[in-house]
Amino acid sequence: MEFKHVLMILGVIILTLAPLIMYSGLGEDEGYFGGADGAAGDLIMEISPNYEPWFEPFWEPPSGEIESLLFALQAAIGALIIGYFFGYNKAKYDDQN
Amino acid sequence: MHIMEGFLPPMWAAIWFLLSGIVVIYGIIQLNKLIKDKPEVKPTLALAGAFMFILSSLKLPSVTGSCSHPTGGGLGAVMFGPAITAVLATIVLLFQAILLAHGGLTTLGANIFSMGIMGPAIGFLVFKLLKGKLNITWVVVLAAIFADWGTYVTTSIQLALAYPLPDFGTALANFGTVFAVTQIPLAIMEGLLTGLIWDYIMKLRPDLLAKLGLIEPAKAEGGAE
């Protein structure tokens, strides 16, 4: 791995950890770490209080746990494909060199 | 960044469906042509789609104290352009709308337009403009960052158009604050991750990138072919 790549990975880690450290001890009840999508929905209800969402999702994950399951599944599908691509090509690459 | 189900008035939902539909259909035609002409690039298509799957499932904390997730559209945009990326984004958005109630079916057109079309189009443009002027890794990083920012600015504009209260400018500023500010650090993160994965493809399969016309064929030697 090149030095550049180490710096890039460090950058990702720092950017992820910084908010958790900055707002350490604060949680959803204080209005932190909620989703931006929901915040936009709240803003719509605030500036246009009479607006009624005219369509409901057909199905919602019955709980936060199930939602995490499906999000994890989504990431796993992606990671499998990427891992396969890189694993397959890395083996071929090592074979040739 | 997703507009929630039911939160766009029917007229706007229809407009964005129409605009996105045209691009997605064009993208499907392009995609079929690409697969027919260069079947060997198929794995990179899967890779770009998979990258979007992962990144859009990572809800990350941002320095503004709210959470959002990257879109992953930058990689596809750089490799295949915005139209094909729109097709990939449609798959991801359908998954999220149907299984996660994240985004929505009525707002699908608008969400495809911001995440699958405008963001990637801006990333694609940045890539074209900077290519050859900087080290290609950083060009890709910047393209992904701008693709991500472009997405959030577009979503803010879409919401401000639908809810110009009290006027368009104020609404745009308000929605922009909710989305774009949260997204500034997340976009940088997405850019770095996109750059990392790009470099790894460059190391292992530069021939595939050369096939797509992204790098000089001369530089494509030494991969795993």
Curated annotation (Swiss-Prot), chain A:
<feature type="transmembrane region" description="Helical">
    <location>
        <begin position="68"/>
        <end position="88"/>
    </location>
</feature>
<dbReference type="InterPro" id="IPR003705">
    <property type="entry name" value="CbiN"/>
</dbReference>
<comment type="subunit">
    <text>Forms an energy-coupling factor (ECF) transporter complex composed of an ATP-binding protein (A component, CbiO), a transmembrane protein (T component, CbiQ) and 2 possible substrate-capture proteins (S components, CbiM and CbiN) of unknown stoichimetry.</text>
</comment>
<keyword id="KW-0171">Cobalt transport</keyword>
<keyword id="KW-1003">Cell membrane</keyword>
<dbReference type="GO" id="GO:0009236">
    <property type="term" value="P:cobalamin biosynthetic process"/>
</dbReference>
<dbReference type="GO" id="GO:0005886">
    <property type="term" value="C:plasma membrane"/>
</dbReference>
<comment type="function">
    <text>Part of the energy-coupling factor (ECF) transporter complex CbiMNOQ involved in cobalt import.</text>
</comment>
<keyword id="KW-1133">Transmembrane helix</keyword>
<keyword id="KW-0812">Transmembrane</keyword>
<keyword id="KW-0472">Membrane</keyword>
<keyword id="KW-0170">Cobalt</keyword>
<keyword id="KW-0169">Cobalamin biosynthesis</keyword>
<dbReference type="GO" id="GO:0015087">
    <property type="term" value="F:cobalt ion transmembrane transporter activity"/>
</dbReference>
<keyword id="KW-0406">Ion transport</keyword>
<comment type="pathway">
    <text>Cofactor biosynthesis; adenosylcobalamin biosynthesis.</text>
</comment>
<feature type="transmembrane region" description="Helical">
    <location>
        <begin position="6"/>
        <end position="26"/>
    </location>
</feature>
<protein>
    <recommendedName>
        <fullName>Cobalt transport protein CbiN</fullName>
    </recommendedName>
</protein>
<dbReference type="Pfam" id="PF02553">
    <property type="entry name" value="CbiN"/>
</dbReference>
<comment type="similarity">
    <text>Belongs to the CbiN family.</text>
</comment>
<keyword id="KW-0813">Transport</keyword>
